[in-house]
Amino acid sequence: TTYNLARMNMILRGIPYRNFNIYNGDTLEHDYFGDKKFRVQVANPPYSANWSADMKFMEDARFNEYGKLAPKSKADFAFVQHMVYHMDEDGRAVVLLPHGVLFRGAAEEVIRKHLIQKLNVLDAVIGLPANLFFGTGIPVCVLVLKRERNGNADNILFIDASKDFEAGKNQNILRQSDIDKIVDAYQRREDIDKYAHVATMQEIEENGFNLNIPRYVDTFEPEEEIDLNEVAADIRKLQSEIKDIDAELKP
């Protein structure tokens, strides 16, 4: 079904069938592309899907350098490893994933640390609003991966775009203005109050390679300060008014 929907989507967008190749298969279990490398990859894989995590993959070039495989019940990082392997020397990749990949421990922590510390391919983490996609209401994040980081090798950009959307009847919608704001923040690559932060590798390491966005982008809105003297005066005034009313009601 997904295969046919993908083909229909291309045709409806006016792309001739001779100009695209769509294959239906399990890309983790059977790597159709072999050693082929790509300059650009975009993916929205099934979130926290099951996969075999067979030990044979420890000899697979896509996974063996990490020393760990993604858990059987959460193939998220397996898709990331697959994409990183197929990036060419100037390759870029963008992948949508659940937020759990940013902070879950055990094998996923090992893989995350390797991507950051050894390969240094993670360029940005972007948090999106909840309920953007059919079939799931969970908020997702975008991982931007780049083989050549062009002067940004000592930092990772975090963007919290989770509050910018238009609420729809069945799902939320990213407006063009919301998309433009994300793109502008990514291109500027600087701290923006309550929206974006450029985290140094030292910060990342001090946080134990935990990439949970609230650790880096503070969106906390302080509560309005309460003037206790003013509150006390209001209470005294009310008490006086109540006393006057009681006096009027007495026979």
Regions from the PLM with identified roles:
Residues 1-36:
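S-adenosyl-L-methionine
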Residues 31, 35-251:
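A conserved structural/catalytic subdomain of Rossmann-like adenosyl-cofactor enzymes
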